[in-house]
């Protein structure tokens, strides 16, 4: 491959791919192009930066220059890719263009910001760059509103509370983690957040934000208002698909790929948060690691399909951590919940009494791997 492989993106997915390619081929040309600095950081750490008093620069693990030298790469940081000419095998920016033999989209996902009046006042914490832009405001804020009670919203609510801030969490669902598990399973964490002092506004909706002399006025439904110093949107991620769409690739929720991570164009692949693998968007570390291993082989001439095992998802709420696996969001499961002082084990079984999902907490998390082996896929 004279032009080699071009990767758009520099996050966890792109880096895992580079490492796996270099294990097998030390010399194939690798070019990475990304809009950010390309410095490496651990994205899950963003859920704990406030309580740990970390600045954005503290998160950097490896600079772009060190990364390029270690893995023999051409890097183009702070570069926006504007177009892909799939027929000519060319990637274009405003001032440059790159030929490729194989192209990988690892463009990630962006935080969804609810379309309410004053939405520009909402902050997002989906990257080191985003945290850098708002770290002073977040550090100084005494009153924080978190919009969204999912995985990230719950982690942030606990972290800000542990940092001594007055935290309000709003969600239109009846319980936290509603898209991941039923109320009877999430209630243990919900109770712990309340005990810590997090003010939960469930079955509630944010209607607008307005800057005031003393902070930000948040207008809620049922004619309610609260004043805060910072508002964080934690309402989910949207795969970055605009570039793929302009290139004529098949798009659904993400960039559609098959079991080989190949898009609708034979020489273009997608990986990580931007990819939709056989109809599934899987924005978690383990499936990305496994996908990167398979894709590295396929880019180098193999024909290996991705086979994902049952995998754990970790909710990093230190006062009450959770691990979950399986189809925890299924509505037709019967939940068998065993709760004791040191933790909880919740098993979701189907009509045939087959284990389809489970959630474990605290000291009972050590039972997760045993349960994983008995999970029906």
Curated annotation (Swiss-Prot):
One of its GO terms (molecular function) is oxidoreductase activity, acting on iron-sulfur proteins as donors, NAD or NADP as acceptor. SUPFAM superfamilies: FAD/NAD(P)-binding domain. The keyword Cell wall biogenesis/degradation does not apply. Its main location: cytoplasm. Its EC number is 1.18.1.-. It is found in: Cytoplasm. Gene3D superfamilies: 3.30.390.120, FAD/NAD(P)-binding domain. It comes from the Bacteria. Pathway: Nitrogen metabolism; nitric oxide reduction. Keywords: Cytoplasm, FAD, Flavoprotein, NAD, Oxidoreductase. It catalyses: 2 reduced [nitric oxide reductase rubredoxin domain] + NAD(+) + H(+) = 2 oxidized [nitric oxide reductase rubredoxin domain] + NADH. GO terms for cellular component: cytoplasm. It holds the Pfam family Pyr_redox_2. The keyword Iron-sulfur does not apply. One of at least two accessory proteins for anaerobic nitric oxide (NO) reductase. Reduces the rubredoxin moiety of NO reductase. Belongs to the FAD-dependent oxidoreductase family. This is Nitric oxide reductase FlRd-NAD(+) reductase. It comes from Escherichia coli O6:H1 (strain CFT073 / ATCC 700928 / UPEC). The gene is norW.
